[in-house]
């Protein structure tokens, strides 16, 4: 039977041959685990995803939430799926045993979550949003806030959201207008409007805890004047019981291109002047707090994009194997049977491109999860700091590269199915529509490119970048031991050398105040940087594949050869194409920057 969510063999390759998941069990936090417990968690995730989430993915899409009597109504299949997720303990997969969690490494929890993201992106979003909100309260909330709001979220009784966007302020959060007035009892009264709030209303939980950005009366201008508040749908009494309905109104639902099973809400806070909120962290420090949740969300968005690309790839692969059509160019006899389309060279090209994109991005997402484990469990402060610097640098890539190129994989999946791919009778068009959100939310490509080039590269004296260059060089040195990888290694080395030169020039210009010209083509820089990182990850996979082939296991030979062919494609087809973008960056080309509004 074909696998539809992800390749279990590829997952095992990543966990146990590339990323050394078993090595994490040597660390104190994960000492109670071993490969058997890891595999058991993955098996449980796969079973729940296949049984509860995948079956209603299409129904979710065809029956988006309805607005009735001030409430959002979902299809009935969503709640049992989410309940199964909660009952299996996945909401707290990475939390400690003492806190009621599985104490899994983030690497393993992300491997588990990947099955749900592939099976049903929309229904999966509800618990995922809750995890992010809970982590925020755990990091910055008071003990009272943790008891009143965090514990019910950990227990799965309360769900959470992230409420940032306003009708006039999307990426530009410094312009938000939601206000918070202090009240005599130490709480605050909020007034404002938020839009595009995923999970902003539903009946999946007893309560919904909104994490809301707002400004205090004395707030300084800009991002330094933003504060963070807990605003529950229902107030919570001191004994933990639910109190009165808070002054939070569901004003309406947005009707989206994809992710139709997730409520996208417009929320009004304080229409009646009595929206109660509680300050989280220090006044005017809300955005720095929220960035923790946003960075977690950005990594989650990247993995979500990967898995939608993965689902489309697997479906189109099965289709190509089963769909007979035409004959090979050298066949001159029309009486011969048609061949499966997978035998045609151009179909192979499209499948190989998908494989290179989704498996390269899958590796990167899991590598980022492994880095997150390193930030908390490596032995020394220095080691943990280095892991954090590298993860911080890579976060824009983890979010944006899969969002762009796994979406392209979805496009190729549609093309492989031809006319069938363009119909709603086949799932690949939904995968594309669902994935089209990922380049937009949690920071657009443009925002990610500015973050990378304008902030992350030079952060801490370029510590993260120096680490990355060193790691790529170490991989290249190991690849030199495999002469068959020379043709794969050399294009990456050439790209890294030129990228370093371009980066130094751009950072020098930025330091000299040439901000507009330096950042004008940041989107091109993001693409090249991302291809460099993915190229590095593919060279790592190629080394492991060579080592696997050397063991002589016949059953694995096709798998490893497929890895090497995908690495060959990416490193010899995709990586060299980046030199065109680098030439534009080197020239500080102002074609786009110099375009005037009235010329359009």
Predicted features and spans:
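Alpha-helix capping/hinge segments and adjacent helical runs
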Residues: 2-5, 10, 182, 259, ...
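A glycine-rich, basic-preceded beta-loop-alpha segment at the flavin cofactor/substrate interface
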Residues: 196-198, 235-251, 256, 266-297, ...
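C-terminal amphipathic alpha-helical interaction region
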Residues: 99, 459, 474-600
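Amphipathic, small/basic residue-rich leader segments at the start of a protein or domain
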Residues: 1-124, 148, 583-584, 590-600
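A short core secondary-structure module
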Residues: 187, 191-245
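C-terminal helix-coil-helix/basic helical segment that borders enzyme active sites and/or dimer interfaces
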Residues: 359-398, 504-520, 541-558
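A structural-propensity feature for long, helix-poor, extended segments
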Residues: 133, 142-145, 149, 444, ...
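Internal maturation/activation junctions in enzymes
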Residues: 126-130, 141-183, 193, 369-388, ...
């Amino acid at each position: 039977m074909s696998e539809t969510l992800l390749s279990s063999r590829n997952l095992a390759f990543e966990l146990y041959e590339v990323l050394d998941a078993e090595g994490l069990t040597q660390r104190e936090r994960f000492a109670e685990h071993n490969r058997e417990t890891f595999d058991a968690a993955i098996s449980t995730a796969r079973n729940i995803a296949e049984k509860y989430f995948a079956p209603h993915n299409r129904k979710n899409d065809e029956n988006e939430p309805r607005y009735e009597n001030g409430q959002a109504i979902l299809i009935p299949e969503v709640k049992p799926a989410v309940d199964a997720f909660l009952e299996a303990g996945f909401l707290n997969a990475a939390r400690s045993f003492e806190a009621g969690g599985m104490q899994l490494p983030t690497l393993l929890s992300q491997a588990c979550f990947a099955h749900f993201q592939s099976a049903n992106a929309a229904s999966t979003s509800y618990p995922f949003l809750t995890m992010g909100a809970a982590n925020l309260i755990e990091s910055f909330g008071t003990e009272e806030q943790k008891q009143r709001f965090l514990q019910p979220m950990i227990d799965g009784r309360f769900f959470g959201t992230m409420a940032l966007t306003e009708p006039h302020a999307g990426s530009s959060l410094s312009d938000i207008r939601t206000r918070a007035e202090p009240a005599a009892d130490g709480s605050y009264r909020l007034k404002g409007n938020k839009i595009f709030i995923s999970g902003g209303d539903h009946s999946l939980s007893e309560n919904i805890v909104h994490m809301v950005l707002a400004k205090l009366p004395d707030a300084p201008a800009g991002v330094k004047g933003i504060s963070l508040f807990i605003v529950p749908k229902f107030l919570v009494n001191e004994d933990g019981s639910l109190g009165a309905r808070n002054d939070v109104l569901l004003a309406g639902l947005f009707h989206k291109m994809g992710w139709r099973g997730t409520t996208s809400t417009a929320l009004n806070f304080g229409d009646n002047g009595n929206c109660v909120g509680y300050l989280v962290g220090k006044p005017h420090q809300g955005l720095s707090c929220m960035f923790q949740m946003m960075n977690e969300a950005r990594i989650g968005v990247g993995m979500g994009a990967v898995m939608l690309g993965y689902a489309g790839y697997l479906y189109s692969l099965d289709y190509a194997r089963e769909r007979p059509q035409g004959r090979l160019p050298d066949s001159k006899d029309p009486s011969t049977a048609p061949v499966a389309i997978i035998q045609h060279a151009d179909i192979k090209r499209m499948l190989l491109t998908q494989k290179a994109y989704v498996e390269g991005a899958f590796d990167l997402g899991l590598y980022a999860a492994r880095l997150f484990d390193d930030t908390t469990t490596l032995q020394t402060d220095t080691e943990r700091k280095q892991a954090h610097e590298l993860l911080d640098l890579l976060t824009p890539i983890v979010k944006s590269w899969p969002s762009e190129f796994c979406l392209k994989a979805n496009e190729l999946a549609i093309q492989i199915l031809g006319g069938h791919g363009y119909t709603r009778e086949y799932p690949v068009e939904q995968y594309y529509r669902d994935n089209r959100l990922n380049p937009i939310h949690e920071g657009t490509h443009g925002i990610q490119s500015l973050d990378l080039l304008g902030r992350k590269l030079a952060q801490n004296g370029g510590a993260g970048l120096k680490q990355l260059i060193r790691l790529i060089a170490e991989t290249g040195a190991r690849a030199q031991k495999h002469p068959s990888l020379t043709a794969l290694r050399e294009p990456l080395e050439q790209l890294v050398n030129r990228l370093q030169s371009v980066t130094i020039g751009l950072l020098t210009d930025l330091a000299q105040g040439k901000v507009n010209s330096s950042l004008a083509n940041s989107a091109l820089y993001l693409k090249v940087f991302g291809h460099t990182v993915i190229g590095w990850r593919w060279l790592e996979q190629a080394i492991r594949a060579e080592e696997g082939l050397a063991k002589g296991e016949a059953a694995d030979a096709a798998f490893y050869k497929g890895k090497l062919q995908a690495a060959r494609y990416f490193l010899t087809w995709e990586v060299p194409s980046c030199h065109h973008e680098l030439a534009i960056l080197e020239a500080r080309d102002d074609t786009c920057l110099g375009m005037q509004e009235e010329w359009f």
